[in-house]
A protein has these predicted regions:
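Bacterial Sec-dependent N-terminal signal peptides
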Residues: 1-29
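Glycan-recognition and catalytic cores of secretory/periplasmic carbohydrate-active enzymes
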Residues: 23-366
Length: 366
């Protein structure tokens, strides 16, 4: 996730008005340096993967520094082709478009996947992005079919898209019936776009229903969100509020807060319903005003982790929030959101977080 989100932040920034002040010139230099670095780093990664032949999708590195490749049904499979697409958008170098198409088209069968909710990540990052820049009928069809597949997970009586199946794996051991995780907000853009492309309002209505139920049940009074809310699919009653990846059920998992800020910003983009933007702002304020947020604005992996300041940082969460901030500035231009996003990008661009050239598996962030 960290690859895609940094590039998204850079791309959103470069589409803002021309820089005219010294501070803006400074961040412009940072961004241009990051783009140059990203092209060199990803060129090295493609050499490692292979520019032709069998498609292998990178996800991370193991403890020995070796590349970890994933099957196409892994939830992260769309991030690498999406990153290649952003490099094409940022450089206008068609070699990146060709590679993005190659890795994107390897995910063709995912449009029919119905056993988990992450198709929004997988197809949204890949097909939806490349369709914006290189539209064709096959890509459009894949986007709409993926939305149709995702909607099979919509539990009408509860009004939500079920995130995980509970009949196997570790999810079957938690006592859940219809778990919904905050990550699911990142799937809704795909549904909104499917309605725009097809004219079928079904996808839009599912997205709005899910956003509303999540707004109603997933957030605390301070604006932070639970990771998992388990529903009774027969009547929509909330059965549990827990975590799967945070420190504790009542803690604030950093990436989950980022999903919420970004997800509700996107919902506002499509619907112009102010309650979505208000929730994005409320969760953002929780993050930015949290006493455990470091000065460089890169959060610890959980705001309530027990060993702060000796806890890992979450660069992916910071990059996701930076991307949301650049967009939120379009809607609330007097709130200083661009300056906050610039601070995050400067931090992520520093040696503390940006990988050395040719190191870290040729990923961008450490």
């Amino acid at each position: 996730m960290k690859i895609r989100k940094l590039l998204l932040s850079l791309g959103v920034f470069l589409m803002t008005p021309a820089f005219c002040h010294a501070e803006n010139n400074d961040i412009s230099n940072v961004i241009n340096n990051d783009i140059n670095f990203s092209t060199r780093q990803y060129s090295l990664m493609l050499q490692q993967i292979g520019r032709e032949g069998k498609v292998r999708i990178p996800k991370t590195i193991d403890k020995l520094g070796r590349m970890v490749y994933i099957p196409i049904d892994d939830w992260c499979s769309g991030f690498f082709p999406g990153s290649l697409c952003y490099l094409y958008q940022l450089t206008n170098d068609k070699s990146w478009l060709l590679q993005s198409r190659r890795f994107t088209e390897a995910l063709d069968s995912i449009q029919y996947l119905t056993w988990h909710h992450d198709v929004g990540f997988m197809i949204g990052s890949s097909y939806l992005n490349i369709y914006r820049l290189n539209p064709n009928k096959a890509y459009k069809k894949a986007i709409i079919q993926t939305a149709k597949s995702l909607c099979t997970r919509f539990r009408k009586k509860a009004g939500v898209i079920q995130s995980w199946n509970v009949d196997r794996g570790w999810q079957s051991k938690r006592g859940w019936t219809c778990p919904v995780i905050i990550d699911n907000m990142m799937n809704l853009e795909l549904l909104f776009e499917a309605t725009r492309l097809s004219g079928d309002s079904t996808y839009w209505k599912v997205a709005v229903s899910h956003a509303n139920k999540t707004l109603e049940n997933q957030f605390r009074k301070d604006g932070s969100c639970y990771h998992v809310v388990d529903y009774d699919p027969n009547n929509g009653a909330v059965l549990h509020r827990q975590t799967a990846q945070g420190y504790a059920d009542n803690s604030a998992w950093a990436r989950g807060q980022a999903w919420a800020v970004y997800g509700y910003t996107v919902c506002y983009r499509y619907t112009h319903d102010r309650k979505y933007l208000d929730q994005a702002v409320k969760t953002l304020n929780f993050v930015m005003q949290n006493p455990n947020l470091p000065n460089d604005l890169i959060p610890y992996w959980d705001f309530d982790a027990p060993n702060i300041p000796n806890e890992p940082r979450d660069a992916s969460s910071a990059a996701c929030i930076a991307s949301a901030l650049y967009e939120m500035n379009n809607y609330l231009p007097d709130n200083g959101y661009t300056s906050l996003a610039d601070r995050i990008i400067r931090s992520l661009s520093s040696p503390e977080y940006r990988a050395p050239l040719g190191k870290n598996g040729c990923f961008l962030l450490m």
